[in-house]
């Protein structure tokens, strides 16, 4: 190859490269190009799409529907009754909230671990699923004033009754994922083997089938379950700190949060939650439980 041919080839390559660079520069300046701020947002983990925001009170009223996340397998708090309808302590509360807003209620059934996600993804307006207030959850959602108080309990077969946590060492404890029982035992009782289930129904079936030595969740729940399942007993009725249960909304949704808080105060003046207890919980607990050990009126402990 002669020198003149080589020189022509090099010039052609340089010219082509320059053309490509110029074309890329023009494209970068076009309407689809990311601005420096957008690039910074992306590199810092920020979303370039708009945030999914919660519905305002006006939007809820105009839609005619209040969207509420509830349990469908946790009697007597949230479950499906024999007629296929949502029922329970939380459901009575949800129906009253919707009534006072002048709308109907639309229920979304959730597993314990999904109670935060349905709010952050804006699938519901309120989570009202026996939701215990914790510092970790407060970082992700906003809690209203409480309407119940609760601790953990442990239920087991009465012929092998667990009456002290020390008896669980080396044994299998059934829990539901995403619950305070899960976090409590992982943090405080590492020698207890945890068998986890997504749904309460599956967890209780595991206990009934003998796949674990005991089951732990809210004491209000295990006390109710043991009353309707012969051969089981709540040997530990109060474990860990006494916590509260409250409605939750999407983080930053102050308008709906303030409305719920005002509603809880108003309902307290008519003793609403004690009436709810009489209707939904007393038929299960009977005289074994003092309603004042569970019920919180007006958000005041």
Where are these regions (language model features)?
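Short helix-initiation/N-cap motifs at beta->coil->alpha
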Residues: 106-117, 160, 177, 195-205, ...
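Acidic, polar ligand-binding/catalytic clefts
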Residues: 95, 104-167
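Extracytoplasmic small-molecule ligand-binding "clamshell" domains
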Residues: 39, 46-130
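Extended ligand-binding regions for polar small-molecule ligands
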Residues: 30, 45-47, 91-100, 179, ...
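A ligand-binding cleft/hinge motif common to bilobed small-molecule-binding domains
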Residues: 117, 131-139, 208-209, 213-242
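Ligand-binding clefts/hinges and TM-proximal coupling segments of bilobed small-molecule sensing domains
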Residues: 36, 46-51, 183-197, 234-238, ...
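Periplasmic-binding protein-like
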Residues: 148-156, 223-264, 284-301
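Bacterial lipoprotein signal-peptidase II cleavage site
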Residues: 26-47
């Amino acid at each position: 190859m002669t020198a003149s041919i080589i020189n022509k080839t090099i010039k052609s390559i340089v010219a082509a490269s320059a053309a490509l660079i110029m074309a890329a520069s023009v494209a970068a300046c076009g309407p689809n190009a990311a601005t420096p701020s957008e690039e910074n947002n992306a590199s810092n983990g920020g979303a370039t799409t708009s945030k999914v925001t919660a519905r305002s009170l006006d939007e809820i009223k105009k839609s005619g529907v209040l969207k509420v996340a509830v349990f469908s397998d946790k009697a007597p708090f949230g479950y499906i009754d024999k007629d296929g309808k949502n029922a329970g302590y939380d459901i009575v509360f949800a129906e009253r909230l919707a009534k006072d807003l002048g709308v109907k209620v639309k229920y979304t059934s959730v597993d314990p671990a999904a109670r935060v996600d349905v709010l952050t993804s804006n699938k519901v307006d309120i989570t009202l699923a026996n939701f215990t207030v914790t510092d970790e959850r407060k970082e992700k959602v906003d809690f209203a004033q409480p309407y119940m108080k609760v601790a953990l309990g442990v239920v087991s077969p009465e012929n092998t009754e667990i009456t002290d946590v020390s008896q669980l060492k080396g044994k299998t404890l059934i829990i539901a994922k995403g619950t305070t029982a899960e976090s409590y035992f992982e943090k405080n009782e590492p020698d207890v083997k945890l068998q986890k289930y997504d749904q309460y129904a599956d967890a209780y079936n595991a206990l009934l089938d003998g796949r674990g030595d005991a089951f732990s969740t809210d004491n209000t729940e295990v006390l109710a379950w043991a009353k309707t399942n012969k051969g089981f007993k709540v040997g530990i009725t109060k474990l860990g700190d006494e916590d509260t249960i409250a409605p939750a909304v999407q983080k930053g949704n102050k308008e709906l949060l303030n409305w719920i808080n005002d509603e809880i105060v108003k309902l307290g003046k008519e003793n609403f939650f004690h009436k709810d207890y009489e209707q939904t919980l007393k038929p299960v607990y009977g005289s074994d439980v003092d309603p004042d050990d569970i019920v919180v009126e007006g958000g005041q402990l």
